[in-house]
């Protein structure tokens, strides 16, 4: 089934200048970029986006990291886009990620792990709406 999902290329990947390589992974695996923008998250936006993690011990570090530099936010579309994106990203901890996944190839740590991807179709819908107006899609 054709779906849309949200992907964020995080500040560590932008600093390494691997944005193009990451986008190529998506496109060469059947995911089309239907909307994209580069921005610098404010603390408030990062806190709102990651509100589900507010009570977790890593929340403060996550917010500091996500506002430490620009990010690239994209809507990816394709067959089973949510699951495909998750597979391409690999495990959250790059040390556990399979060889050939984005995190195994480009991430440094569980915190600086290169990419974010929606974990469900419902969250994809909400996350896309957080960054993109319907007219932009």
Curated annotation (Swiss-Prot):
ATP binds at residues 10, 58, 86, 92, 103, 113. Keywords: ATP-binding, Cytoplasm, Kinase, Magnesium, Metal-binding, Nucleotide metabolism, Nucleotide-binding, Phosphoprotein, Transferase. The keyword Kinase applies. It is an enzyme of class 2 (transferase). It catalyses: a 2'-deoxyribonucleoside 5'-diphosphate + ATP = a 2'-deoxyribonucleoside 5'-triphosphate + ADP; a ribonucleoside 5'-diphosphate + ATP = a ribonucleoside 5'-triphosphate + ADP. The active site is at 116 (pros-phosphohistidine intermediate). GO terms for biological process: CTP biosynthetic process; GTP biosynthetic process; purine nucleotide metabolic process; pyrimidine nucleotide metabolic process; UTP biosynthetic process. Its cofactor is Mg(2+). It is found in: Cytoplasm. GO terms for cellular component: cytoplasm. Its EC number is 2.7.4.6. It holds the Pfam family NDK. CDD domains: NDPk_I. Disulfide bonds: none annotated. One of its GO terms (molecular function) is nucleoside diphosphate kinase activity. Homotetramer. Belongs to the NDK family. Major role in the synthesis of nucleoside triphosphates other than ATP. The ATP gamma phosphate is transferred to the NDP beta phosphate via a ping-pong mechanism, using a phosphorylated active-site intermediate. This is Nucleoside diphosphate kinase. The lineage of its organism: Bacteria, Pseudomonadati, Campylobacterota, Epsilonproteobacteria, Campylobacterales. The gene is ndk.
């Amino acid at each position: 089934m054709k779906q849309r999902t949200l992907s964020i290329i995080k500040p560590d990947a932008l600093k390494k200048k691997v944005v193009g390589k990451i986008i190529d992974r998506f496109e060469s695996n059947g995911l089309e970029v239907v909307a994209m923008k580069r921005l610098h998250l404010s603390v408030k936006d990062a806190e709102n986006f990651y509100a589900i993690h507010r009570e977790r011990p890593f929340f403060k570090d996550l917010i500091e990291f996500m506002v430490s530099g620009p990010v690239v936010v994209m809507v990816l579309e394709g067959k089973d886009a949510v699951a495909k994106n998750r597979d391409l990203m690999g495990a959250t901890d790059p040390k556990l990620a399979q060889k050939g996944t984005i995190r195994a190839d480009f991430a440094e740590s569980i915190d600086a792990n290169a990419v974010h991807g929606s974990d469900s179709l419902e969250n994809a819908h909400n996350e896309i709406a957080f960054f993109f107006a319907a007219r932009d899609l």
